[in-house]
Amino acid sequence: MTPIQGEWKIDAIGLPPQVLRKIYFDNAHRLLVRSLPAPEIKAVRIGRDIKLTGDLRAAAWDNAPVAHLDYALRDGAVHQSVATTVRVLWSDKYLYLGYEGPFSRLNVFRPAWLDKERAGLWDRDVVEAFIGTDPGNPLHYTEFEVAPTGEKLDLDIHLPGKSLEWQSGFQAATVVHQGRSTWTTEMRIPLSALSKDKPVVGTRWRLNLYRHDLDHHAFLAWSPTANDTAHTPEKFGYLIFGP
């Protein structure tokens, strides 16, 4: 066998796309997770509010950019089997978030509490949004969670404390699509609950998006925090209010 000398490389000819992604992107992402730039997503403005159906069937969702939740919060490891997408819309009154992700088996509280909030909802399968609107106080932000059962929870965070008594008035609708093993949810959050200053086109808020999936031991993050907690506001990405 001829020894390898000088510069050399591995050609990617014939390798399937998922292998190429792992070699060239996922491994690099994991290695660089502590120094990656903050991601950005632009919310699309809608002229009229949409009805919450839970299944993202309103036409407005089709035009919204997509945030991808592919990576583990702690170390940036890829979890493609439960990769989740999030779309963002806004109107004069509300911020809308639409989540979609696959599942193998749902882990939820039974019976579901649909008329009151459950502290510890995050200990089962949920999707989450953490939203910071005050650049002068990054330790203050709000947290929103929705479970596949339709249970929901909102919290006002002032690190290191949190208020479960706070009520934002946010609404959510959820659909579990058993036939294709996915679940979807739509959140509608009053802008007035997020900031006293109404956003305009170009406004930038801090945002991170998460998903817990116990069956796959996955805690996914849009912007991985590179530690064991989602409550790391310096690692939040940016929500930009677009036209």
Range-by-range predicted roles:
Residues 37-243:
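Structural preference for beta-rich elements and adjacent junctions enriched in aromatics
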Residues 1-37:
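Mid-to-C-terminal alpha-helical segments outside catalytic/metal-binding sites
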